[in-house]
Swiss-Prot record:
GO annotation, biological process: glutamyl-tRNA aminoacylation
Record's GO cellular component terms: cytosol
Localization in the cell: Cytoplasm
List of residues binding ATP: K296
Record bears the keyword Ligase: yes
EC numbers on record: 6.1.1.17
Enzyme class label: ligase
Name of the protein: Glutamate--tRNA ligase
Family in the record: Belongs to the class-I aminoacyl-tRNA synthetase family. Glutamate--tRNA ligase type 1 subfamily.
Amino acid sequence: MSFEKLADIIFGNVEHTTEYYVEKYPKRSLKEGARVTRYAPSPTGFQHIGGVFAALINERLASQSEGVFYLRIEDTDQKREVEGAIEDTIATMHNFGMDFSEGMTGEETSKGEYGPYRQSQRAEIYNTFAKDLLIKGLAYPDFCTPEELAQLRERQIANKITPGYYGEYAKFRNITEEEAIKRIENGEKYIIRLKSPGNPEKRVEFHDLIKGDISFPENNQDVVLIKGDGLPTYHFAHAIDDYLMRTTDVIRGEEWLSSLPIHVQLFEVLGFEAPRYAHIPTIMKQDGGSKRKLSKRKDAEAAVSYYKEVGFPVVTVIEYLLNIVNSTYEEWRAENPKADYHEFEVHLEKMGKSGALFDLVKLNDVSKDRIAAMKATDVYEYYTAWAKEFDAEMYKLVTENETMAKEIFNIDKEGPKPRKDFAKWDEVKDKIFYFFDELFYKESAEQIELPKGVTLEAAKEIVETYKKEFKFDVESQEAWFDDLKEIGIRLGYCANRKEFKANPDQYKGMISDVAGAVRAALTHRTNSPDIYTIMQIIGEENTRNRFDKFLNI
């Protein structure tokens, strides 16, 4: 059934033919094997870590094949649009080292020859293809009200019939052109639906780049193509956009897998060659004895802003996500400790098929490794950039004491086993505060940590003697420790663990207790870098002042 007259009434403002757009957006001139991928978010709120995960896969595959990675904004649901979301998306991706070859560059700006890259600006294109389907009898106007559709669904469920708008349950599927025109002239509201040629008793065989070979029944639902506001549904826009923008690989979350029968059918009905599909496993979280989807409501780490606020270096988040993408990344990193992550090649076929577990403990481990491998000057730059925005007090202290701060960040950096003190920048303050008098002298006596089994009285006795006898200007850490050991032995502490275990009553404790008391006086903590290095950084006068403070508690 042809609807030429009806098509002219509904889409009277359409200026071009489908052939015009197919010619306007020709196949891209790229080398063989180059992939064209996209990140296509809706501007409806904050960036989810799952979005960064998907974008990273798309960007890596395009980049490593010398292809194109573009940004398309899917803003057909304008009621939910959040102001500034597009700029936030662009800034977030840039912050994560992902810049787009083409696409949106701002709220109203873009670059590239395959635009517009904002769906709300592509109505003419969608209407052209909808008009063509209407003329061919592959689409029709549906005048059902929301109330009628709700009642239909209730009846279907009550009678244990597959719910939906299809076949005999599609009231206006076989409407005549004359009736449709009359209803439109009477001012009745309508939408445009696909007249599905599918038979659910037939199956479609399909190869997913991650899931492998899958089979599903043909779609027989008369899905909506154009909504009442004149904008397309996601399904219709996806087929047209990804064909005309010449996307080679649609890489998206597995929540869209159930829509694949509709999308495959739309490509066939429109006469388009379908792209390759890869459905990424959903990011999951361990919650007690079970796994669940990482939730925007329940989990702070679901929001991309969380990683910035707590201070995970961007590169560590990327490297952790690459661990999820391909389990071989961890082995590659161990073999290439100094290599840039861009050198790692992502392979979809090596990706897990089931839910990807997001583990903050593992992320912390990855982050500690990467920060430990950084140069002290880089740690300083990254930390001050973070502190400037999130910790004004520390920003002031480290920038006013830049030389000392870099010395602190360089502790044990050049040895075979660098310290792994920090996983994120919000941990730095608690780990290095004692280097700064402004923070150290704020601490109360109750905050001082003593070695297990060492009383405050015993610790004071050690510090009082050590203050009188220690030598500050010793040539090495080894010489400093020999000095500490001699003082400890004179105080009645054992230097040999085996001897102490054999005769514990003959000693006050171990030399480690002596070192622990000195550490407590200088740092108020039981865990810190070696005491000799701390003393060299804060200086002799400050060292003696801290001993005095401790003795006056």
